[in-house]
Design a protein with these regions (language model features):
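Short aromatic-rich membrane-water interface segments that cap or initiate transmembrane helices
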Residues: 39-57, 174-187, 374-386, 467-475, ...
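Membrane-helix interface motif
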Residues: 24-35, 157-168, 358-371, 444-463, ...
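Membrane-interface and transmembrane segments of multi-pass membrane proteins
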Residues: 423-557, 670, 686-698
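Alpha-helical transmembrane segments and their helix-start/interface "positive-inside/aromatic belt" motifs
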Residues: 2-14, 136-145, 340-349, 422-437, ...
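Flexible extramembrane loops and terminal tails that flank transmembrane helices
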Residues: 563, 574-583, 589-595, 649-748
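Transmembrane helix-loop-helix hairpins at membrane boundaries of multipass inner-membrane proteins
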Residues: 1-88, 160-179, 205, 236-238, ...
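Hydrophobic alpha-helical membrane-insertion segments
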Residues: 10-24, 147-156, 350-357, 431-449, ...
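Hydrophobic transmembrane alpha-helices and their helix-loop junctions in integral membrane proteins
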Residues: 68-109, 119-415, 419-424, 560, ...
């Protein structure tokens, strides 16, 4: 069996088995399961998995949709040159996604969050020979990974202010967080991370570009998993920030804008995958809008729509890949020319598009009714209902247009595309068909299957025992009338699509407001130009300039840190003893002689004087072992310099720039800053858990009384080994350079 099939089927088995476990947990009435694996208390870092109701829903979609994607990939990637790397990256991405939704510790969530961005970058750039693919991958990485920094800062601030390093601890400190002066800042940081990950306005430009990735990648990452992480984060934080006014304003504004703008962009687009990308952004905006409303109706609608969108969008992306690769139909116009779709392709496409429209008896119909009910029962019912009709009308029009392009009778004059035999292979349509059938099952058996899965998550979010009450049919009510009006509006848009897309107002909106890619490219270009200017200014090629800049920056940092110390007082400064002053004077004298010496011998002996002063300092500090080591090092260095000095030109010891007033000032500044900070640190030195651990455990665990040596050779032996290894590699590198450099007489 080929390695491709072994990998694909292996991931199918693993993800299916994990999905069955999460499904079993979803049907149990148990509370959240917390599995602690390892923790490092000083940094508030803990590897712990929190498997609760909402984590079950997310993990279930990741596992089972992922299994179907790998099944689809086994056929789609058969002739792909980099299929092994794509499949392995997809597998790593799947497990990083699982870690993200199951992790409880905020720092662990951040690590997994950024891993998904890195794997997404690698998967998008599989065809890295193309410039547009590289730009798409870079756009994805910069926006999503950059947004993840907001999550990191949120974690740091929550640990600093409240000692809360996990979602469960944040919920415990809910009242303190809301009353804290930095509560709005924490919410803005979380929103920044969520909006960038879920491609919300104004960070939505990366997702349409990511369609440069192969279809299995788009079907998995950009429909049901990675792009929903932002929504996942908002759901996790809903019990904490959901009652804040800023939450409602921010999420309703950004979600509503994304919902509408992306819907219009999808309606204008011609490429199938681009249409699906924009409708994904629109759907994510709708979820954010529902969470922003924050009512029990909207939370229920968001949870149900989360499942609906994952089912139909991943199915459509798989079918779009089939059409583009094997039918050569990646645009609406080319799709209209294909006349011989297989029955399974047509059926899968009809089911997916019906879910996108929201037709009965699919779960999507229940979801649409809930969305309308949520807007009708909101505070701004008229505005939000109008927004829902207009934005959803554009998205529904896209579904009707794609469906009509596939199903409408073909004109005989048109050239028919021959259907590749590979595209009839069932594994290309079977996964999409399964997802469509699941949409029907979840709709028809909503109260028997869907409601038990979602009920506990719903209760936890709204903190109430209100029934979920998922019914397929609620009768002819006002919500049904709004749904009908939306469908009529969408049909009108689909019929007159070509005329509407040519209107000047649509074109001007696309040019000025909707095209975020141009603004992103502008920012990246200007930033690159700024970096070039900075590089040309700072990277002069002179070592003296580099040393000056680094020393000035270091001195400023040290000086500011010392002066702004909370307990700053001249009384806190501990001055050195007389013996230490002798060592310091030897070091200073040797340094001054080196700077002013014009002979090789004088410079070398002065350098030895500096080493002698350092040895005196070690002896005065009762560090005899360090003093002995220093003597050995200085002796060896002195011998080496004596041999090298014969070939060193005399001009190397000339005074030059090193004795200038600027150099002297910088040297004094950096020395004074180091000395001042060191004396302050000695005064304010506090015992930590780490230092106490080394002091108490050096004898019982490492059988050594010299704590410094024990740390180097026992507790941190791998660090020491790594340092030794680095020095050996550096020595080998220097030896290689010496051998390849032409030897000139009299010069080294």
């Amino acid at each position: 069996m080929p390695l491709t099939l072994i990998l694909c089927y292996g991931f199918v088995i693993i993800l299916t088995a994990l999905g069955c476990i999460f499904l079993a947990l979803a049907f149990t009435d148990s509370t959240a399961l917390l599995i602690k694996i390892w923790q490092f208390e000083p940094l508030h870092f803990e590897i712990a998995l929190r498997i609760d109701s909402f984590a079950n829903i997310c993990a279930l979609s990741i596992c089972w949709i992922g299994a179907l994607i790998f099944l689809y990939s086994s056929s789609y990637l058969k002739s792909y040159s980099r299929r092994i790397s794509v499949i392995c990256m997809l597998g790593l991405f799947a497990f990083s996604m699982l870690l993200t939704v199951l992790a409880d510790n905020l720092i662990l969530v951040f690590i997994a969050w950024e891993l998904t961005s890195i794997f997404s970058y690698a998967l998008i750039s599989t065809e890295r020979e193309k410039p547009e693919v590289r730009m798409a991958a870079l756009s994805s990485l910069l926006i999503t990974a950059g947004g993840g920094l907001g999550l990191l800062i949120l974690a740091i601030l929550s640990i600093t202010f409240f000692g809360a390093a996990s979602f469960s601890e944040l919920e415990f400190y809910k009242d303190q967080i809301i009353a804290h002066p930095w509560s709005h800042t924490l919410l803005l940081l979380a929103s920044f991370a969520a909006f960038s990950k879920s491609a919300q306005f104004p960070f939505s430009s990366w997702l349409p570009r990511a369609m440069a990735a192969p279809s299995p990648v788009s079907a998995y990452l950009h429909s049901a998993t990675m792009v929903t992480l932002g929504v996942y984060l908002l759901v996790r934080l809903f019990p904490i920030f959901g009652s804040m006014e800023l939450w409602t304003i921010l999420l309703c504004t950004i979600g509503g804008l994304s919902f509408l703008v992306a819907g219009i962009r999808a309606f204008i687009a011609e490429k199938i995958k681009t249409i699906l990308a924009h409708t994904t952004v629109s759907a994510l905006g709708l979820m954010v809008l529902m969470l922003g409303i924050g009512s029990p109706y909207s939370v229920k609608a968001a949870l149900v729509f989360y499942i609906v969108h994952a089912l139909y969008k991943s199915s459509l992306f798989m079918l779009a890949g089939d059409f583009a690769k094997f039918q050569k139909s990646n645009t609406l116009q080319k799709l209209e020319e294909v006349d011989n779709f297989s029955f399974s392709s047509k059926l899968a496409c009809i089911l997916a598009l019906a879910a996108m429209v929201g037709l009965p008896p699919l779960l999507a119909f229940i979801s649409k009714e809930l969305l309308i009910e949520a807007t009708l029962n909101s505070k701004s019912a008229l505005l939000l209902t109008a927004l829902l009709i207009i934005a959803n009308g554009f998205v529904t029009a896209c579904a009707l247009t794609i469906g009509w392009s596939i199903l409408k009778p073909k004109k005989k004059k048109r050239k028919k595309h021959s259907l590749s035999p590979v595209s009839n292979f069932s594994l290309l349509t079977f996964p999409a068909l399964i997802l469509g059938i699941l949409g029907i099952i979840f709709g028809v058996l909503a109260q028997e299957i869907t409601e038990p899965i979602l009920a506990e998550a719903y209760f936890n979010l709204i903190a109430s025992d209100k029934e979920l009450d998922l019914k397929l049919w609620h009768g002819f009510n006002f919500a049904f009338a709004v749904s009908t009006a939306t469908l009529v509006f969408a049909a009108f848009l689909a019929i007159y699509r070509k005329s509407i897309t040519k209107l000047k107002i649509i074109l001007s909106l696309e040019e000025l407001f909707l095209n975020g890619q141009k603004y992103f490219d502008f920012v990246v270009y200007r930033f690159s130009a700024l970096c070039k200017i900075a590089t040309s200014y700072f990277q002069t090629g002179k070592l003296t300039d580099y040393l000056v800049l680094n020393f000035i920056a270091l001195a400023c940092v040290l000086a500011v840190g010392a002066v702004t110390h909370s307990n700053f007082d001249m009384k806190n400064i501990i001055f050195p003893s007389e013996a230490l002053l002798i060592g310091a004077l030897l070091i200073i004298a040797g340094s001054v002689i080196i700077l002013n010496s014009d002979s090789r011998a004088g410079g070398i002996l002065s350098l030895a004087l500096v080493g002698l002063g350092t040895t005196v300092v070690f002896v005065c500090s009762s560090a005899i072992d360090l003093a002995l080591t220093q003597i050995l090092v200085e002796t060896l260095t002195l011998v080496i310099f004596v041999f090298i000095a014969i070939k060193v030109p005399k001009k190397y010891f000339s005074i030059g720039a090193s004795s200038s007033a600027v150099s002297h000032f910088i040297a004094l500044l950096i020395g004074a800053s180091f000395a001042f900070l060191h004396m302050m640190a000695l005064r304010s030195q506090e015992s930590t858990e780490i230092s106490e651990y080394y002091l108490t455990q050096s004898i019982p665990q490492a059988f050594g009384g010299n704590v410094v040596n024990v740390i180097l050779v026992d507790f941190r032996s791998f660090d020491t080994f790594g340092e030794v290894l680095v020095l050996c590699i550096a020595a080998l590198g220097v030896l290689a350079l010496i051998r390849i450099i032409p030897q000139h007489k009299g010069n080294l």
